[in-house]
């Protein structure tokens, strides 16, 4: 059986660029924030690690030469992970998208489209678990069933709260993510860039289904307004308490809510 890591303990990169910059970064179980001036290699560090993780998360045999990970437990050979990037570029492969009858214009739209599929699967899985619990005949079956549905409700409450200034609310009876705004129905693709970004992050974390995941985020705050930047880390940890965040940022707002001690400067993990 595949043995999955709970989290990454250490990232070592022998040379970030050809023959220079040896990186050794010891990580916190929950929150790790990489800072530094532009061009110092923050995104490169994240990219080198992500590139070495196979699609299914198997890592020792795929790691780029000179990149080493220590994980907990040490014998684990697999990592569940997700990647959030900030740049919302126009879609390059429009041909592929045209086969799907939707107005997907940017990479973030495509990401949301894929997340909608995962969200449907997630709901089916939760529904099956709820049925199994209720059929078990255990005295606390109703309580257990309610606990299973709590993360989805928490996610919906979070999004409604974030979007309240524009009057948007999630339509809770719909299977897919859809919004109501003053009587009009909206799809996620009609949201603003910042709304799409925060929705994509929270939806990604919800469908992880409380499992141990590593969430790589490369400057996720770029299109988020100030208040959302401050809330970001707390919301992610609330939605999946078993997550480990490894992120880069330029924004002081992201760390304002009690995360300043989790900030690491690239220079501090560079061995000369």
Describe the function of each predicted region:
Residues 1-56, 172-272:
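Switch/communication elements of ASCE P-loop NTPase nucleotide-binding domains
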Residues 1-18, 24-26, 47-193:
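Phosphate-coordinating catalytic segments in nucleotide- and nucleic-acid-processing enzymes
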